[in-house]
């Protein structure tokens, strides 16, 4: 009890003692190769950056490295979040996430920064963190290593408090913990630590504002995910029963199953070496080429098998070993950067898999958003599907009949009909499951713009339409759903007004033709006045339309001016960052001198104001009918359940993995583990078993499905096994 009370106080006192100045972390972008060539565009801005080391232990011994990107248009205390991104491994640097996935930069073949149109910094500040100690540029002076996830969480909390003390403006922002792969273990543990910290705070202002976890291709439940390798590979045609190596794969799978069912006292429940070997046998069936474990429809040279994928990895290493770059990032250059360090190992003898933390986190009100590329093998969609199918939260198991299904498409421009299939979405009881069509293990690497739509869903910046009997979510490059709906509504109203005007003109013309000639001449002055008034009304409406168009044009002009004025020459293409680093090189724009006629200005302003007041009521009703909040409630957002499966109607040939099959043997299974999560050998393989496996070990009832005994034919010519401890979960 004393420990629980004193620890937060010690953490806070530690942060006060350091007293870091954020100016010391400011990054001079001019020192980064290619930076001066970057220009602002409508959908991308040159970021303001901070980087360096902050303590992750109270004795200041362990130093975590971070690199933070801000959108220069972001104002203080606005509603945009702080996103902390974590790569996996353990031991894989989040700088890969910064330069190959969701950061504002990508690298060309010269290791120069170029813009990433799908950067998440356009939706909030993004911080990339190297952790645990020993990962990337993070280090410990005394070589203090951690071995448990709880210890890693403690270090993260110390870093986070130091960060907030250094960047107090971010304290009130919503914190989003996001990451991929083994971050599926980190993020739930870190979130649990944050919730515990918040419970100990008496002052509401001292609490950390966390509401959601984003986990991509997550490693959540090793038992079920290990057992998905063979059935998933069969389903996708990666392996076939006729393959010479198939029997050997089955034998290794049985070894994995037996290991999972054994007593793990004194051993980790997060890593099973015999199960890692299953994947090694699947991807390397000969010594010439093998399957890319991170994107199974691509092949790689043996024995790499995806370890050198993606190709940007070599450019990233070149960039992060450049002395000028390291100096600009305030990074420790005592050892060379590598993407994944094999010496960073977590024993996790005490730790439980993070899947066991998730039910309580969901029930506490934290949202969980899982997103998966459907071409990933190492953390595949079938494995995640099996994990969720057995997950119990809020009194139910898995998704129920209340789940709603949505298709998801992406458009560069909402006004265009050109769109790409992005994936599908499933949502119920605080948990969202998203699949990205044709996505890899590193979803944002090959689907950057589409993956940013995940953030847009969370913040209700997607369009919901009903077509072909299905609900469909539409995300876009700019995510400006409000602007799109307002423009769409204005166009509809303008068309209605034009139709009314034409009708009035026709009626007036008919009235004039019915009058007598004398009456026309007698009433000519009055008719002239009426016609003049009508013309004035038409001109006023035209002025309103023109003003709306001018507003749009002005926005485009301002973007263009921002680009031109921000980059007057090739000598200063970074928006003035070298002139004023602390202010982040604000982009100043010249005042528009047109419209200096105040009389005309106020006339137009009055007309626009009147138009806005009238249109506001219509727009409000229109938005309510077409725009639906997604994912979270509270703070003005209502809940909308949503659902879609990315591996619909799983077909594993003769290998049935249905839950309700009564013929699966479950003897020796631990607690909730059942063999139906894997597969069974069916009747048509019975002949293959004869002469290889004793009949006493097999069930041969007609129509039955059985565990049987996995069999193997010795094969001295089989390919050398790949050690899967070398294949990291980035």
From Swiss-Prot:
GO biological process: apoptotic process; proteolysis
Keyword entries, A-Z: Apoptosis, Carboxypeptidase, Glycoprotein, Golgi apparatus, Hydrolase, Membrane, Protease, Signal, Transmembrane, Transmembrane helix
First and last residue of the signal peptide: 1-19
GO cellular component: membrane; trans-Golgi network
Enzyme Commission number(s) of this protein: 3.4.16.6
Renumbered residue ranges of the record's region Disordered: 475-590, 684-730
Feature: compositional bias, Basic and acidic residues: 486-497, 515-526
Keyword flag Transport: no
InterPro entries, alphabetized: AB_hydrolase_fold, Peptidase_S10, Ser_caboxypep_ser_AS
SUPFAM superfamilies given in the database record: alpha/beta-Hydrolases
Membrane topology (Lumenal): 20-599
Compositionally biased region (Basic residues): 699-709
Role noted for this protein: Protease with a carboxypeptidase B-like function involved in the C-terminal processing of the lysine and arginine residues from protein precursors. Promotes cell fusion and is involved in the programmed cell death.
PANTHER family assigned to the protein according to its UniProt record, in alphabetical order: PHEROMONE-PROCESSING CARBOXYPEPTIDASE KEX1, SERINE PROTEASE FAMILY S10 SERINE CARBOXYPEPTIDASE
Protein name (record): Pheromone-processing carboxypeptidase KEX1
Gene: KEX1
């Amino acid at each position: 009890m004393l420990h629980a009370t004193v620890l937060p106080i010690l953490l806070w006192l530690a942060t006060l003692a350091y007293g870091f100045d954020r100016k010391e972390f400011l990054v001079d972008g001019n020192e980064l190769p290619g930076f001066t060539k970057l220009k602002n565009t409508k959908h991308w801005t040159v970021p303001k950056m901070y980087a360096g080391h902050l303590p992750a232990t109270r004795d200041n011994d362990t130093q975590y490295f971070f690199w933070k990107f801000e959108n220069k248009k972001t104002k203080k205390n606005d509603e945009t979040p702080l996103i902390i991104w974590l790569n996996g491994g353990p031991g894989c640097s989040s700088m890969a996430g910064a330069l190959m996935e969701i950061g504002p930069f990508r690298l060309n073949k010269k290791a120069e920064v170029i813009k990433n149109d799908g950067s998440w910094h356009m939706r909030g500040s993004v911080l990339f963190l190297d952790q645990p100690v020993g990962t990337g540029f993070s280090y410990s002076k005394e070589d203090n290593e951690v071995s448990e996830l709880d210890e890693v969480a403690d270090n993260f909390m110390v870093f986070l408090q130091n960060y907030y003390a250094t960047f107090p403006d971010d304290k009130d922002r919503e914190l989003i913990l996001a990451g991929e792969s083994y971050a599926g273990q980190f993020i739930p543990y870190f979130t649990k630590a944050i919730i515990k910290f918040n419970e100990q705070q008496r002052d509401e202002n001292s609490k950390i504002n966390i509401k959601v976890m984003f986990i991509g291709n997550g490693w959540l439940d090793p038992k079920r995910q290990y057992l998905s390798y063979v059935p998933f590979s069969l389903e996708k045609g990666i392996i076939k029963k006729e393959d010479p190596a198939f029997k050997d794969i089955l034998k290794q799978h049985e070894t994995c199953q037996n290991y999972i069912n054994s007593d793990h006292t004194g051993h980790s429940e997060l890593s099973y070496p015999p199960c890692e070997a299953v994947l090694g046998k699947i991807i390397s069936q000969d010594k010439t080429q093998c399957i890319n474990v991170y994107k199974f429809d691509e092949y790689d040279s043996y024995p790499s098998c995806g370890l050198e994928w993606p190709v940007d990895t070599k450019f990233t290493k070149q960039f992060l070993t450049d002395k000028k770059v390291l100096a600009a990032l305030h990074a420790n250059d005592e050892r060379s950067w590598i993407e994944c360090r094999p010496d960073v190992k977590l024993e996790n003898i005490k730790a439980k898999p993070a899947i066991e933390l998730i039910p309580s986190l969901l029930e506490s009100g934290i949202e969980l958003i899982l997103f998966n590329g459907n071409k990933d093998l190492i953390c595949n969609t079938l494995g995640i599907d099996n994990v969720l199918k057995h997950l119990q939260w809020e009194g139910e198991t898995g998704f129920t009949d209340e789940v709603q299904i949505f298709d998801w498409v992406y458009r560069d421009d909402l006004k265009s009909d050109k769109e790409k299939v992005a994936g599908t979405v499933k949502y119920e009881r605080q948990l969202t499951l998203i699949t990205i069509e044709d996505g890899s293990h590193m979803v944002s690497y090959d689907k950057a713009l589409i993956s940013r739509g995940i953030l847009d869903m969370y913040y209700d910046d997607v369009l919901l339409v009903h077509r072909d009997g299905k609900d469909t979510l539409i995300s876009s490059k700019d995510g400006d759903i409000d602007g799109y709906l307002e423009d769409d509504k204005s166009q509809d109203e303008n068309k209605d007004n034009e139709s009314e005007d034409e009708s009035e003109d026709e009626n007036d013309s008919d009235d004039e033709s019915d009058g007598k000639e004398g009456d026309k001449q007698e009433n000519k002055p009055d008719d002239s006045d009426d016609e003049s008034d009508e013309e004035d009304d038409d001109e006023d409406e035209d002025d309103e339309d023109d003003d709306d168009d001018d507003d749009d044009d002005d926005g485009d002009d301002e973007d263009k001016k921002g680009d031109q004025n921000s980059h007057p020459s090739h000598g200063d293409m970074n928006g003035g960052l070298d002139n004023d680093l602390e202010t982040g090189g604000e982009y100043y724009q010249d005042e528009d001198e047109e419209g200096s006629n105040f009389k005309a200005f106020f006339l137009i302003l009055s007309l626009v104001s009147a138009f806005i007041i009238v249109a506001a009521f219509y727009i409000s009703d229109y938005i309510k009918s077409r725009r639906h909040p997604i994912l979270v409630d509270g703070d003005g957002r209502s809940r909308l359940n949503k659902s879609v499966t990315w591996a619909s109607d799983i077909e594993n040939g003769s290998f049935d993995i249905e839950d309700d099959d009564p013929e699966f043997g479950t003897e020796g299974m631990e607690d909730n583990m059942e063999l139906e999560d894997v597969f069974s050998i069916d009747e048509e393989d019975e002949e293959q078993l004869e002469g290889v496996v004793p009949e006493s070990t097999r069930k041969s009832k007609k129509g039955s499905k059985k565990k049987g005994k996995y069999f193997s034919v010795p094969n001295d010519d089989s390919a050398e096994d790949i050690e899967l401890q070398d294949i990291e979960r980035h």
